[in-house]
From Swiss-Prot:
Signal peptide: none annotated. One of its GO terms (molecular function) is structural constituent of ribosome. This is Large ribosomal subunit protein uL16. It comes from Mycobacterium leprae (strain TN). Belongs to the universal ribosomal protein uL16 family. Part of the 50S ribosomal subunit. Binds 23S rRNA and is also seen to make contacts with the A and possibly P site tRNAs. It holds the Pfam family Ribosomal_L16. Residues 1-17 have a biased composition (Basic residues). GO terms for cellular component: cytosolic large ribosomal subunit. Residues 1-22 are annotated as: Disordered. The lineage of its organism: Bacteria, Bacillati, Actinomycetota, Actinomycetes, Mycobacteriales.
């Protein structure tokens, strides 16, 4: 699982999800990438599930890059707990994804297989996304 080794503060505020990504919007390492089209929190489990889906489809001969890291804790209070008495304990680690951000990159010789693998990964993520290549990017 992807979680930070050490954090300065155990709990954080929840940022507003607005604006578009300023960095990480191009495919830099591989030939194909998954680009987000909307705002979302993506958890460490969803990232891992998408990575496994890609690796199982391409088997061998390709390389996958994960360009996002869940560095923000989300808290939750226990069930049937009254309001008040402080903030809940950290439950998940998430990354705040903005539109235009490239989440995964893939290098693979066959374009059809690469697109099929990335499509499977998109189905594991809680956002609308599209497949971009190194040539066609916005």
């Amino acid at each position: 699982m992807l979680i930070p080794r050490k954090v300065k503060h155990r709990k954080q505020h929840h940022p507003r999800q607005r604006g578009i990504a300023s960095g990480g919007t191009k495919v830099n390492f591989g030939d194909y990438g998954i680009q987000a089209l909307e705002h979302a929190y993506v958890t460490n489990r969803q990232i891992e599930s998408a990575r496994i889906a890609i690796n199982r489809h391409i088997k061998r001969g390709g390389k996958v890059w994960i360009n996002i890291f869940p560095d923000r804790p989300l808290t939750k209070k226990p069930a049937e707990t009254r309001m008040g008495s402080g903030k809940g304990s950290p439950e998940w680690w998430v990354v705040n994804v903005k539109p235009g951000r490239v989440l995964f990159e893939l290098s693979y010789p066959n374009e059809q297989t690469a697109r099929a693998a990335l499509t499977r990964a998109i189905h594991k993520l809680p956002i609308k996304a599209r497949i971009v290549t190194r040539e066609e990017q916005f």
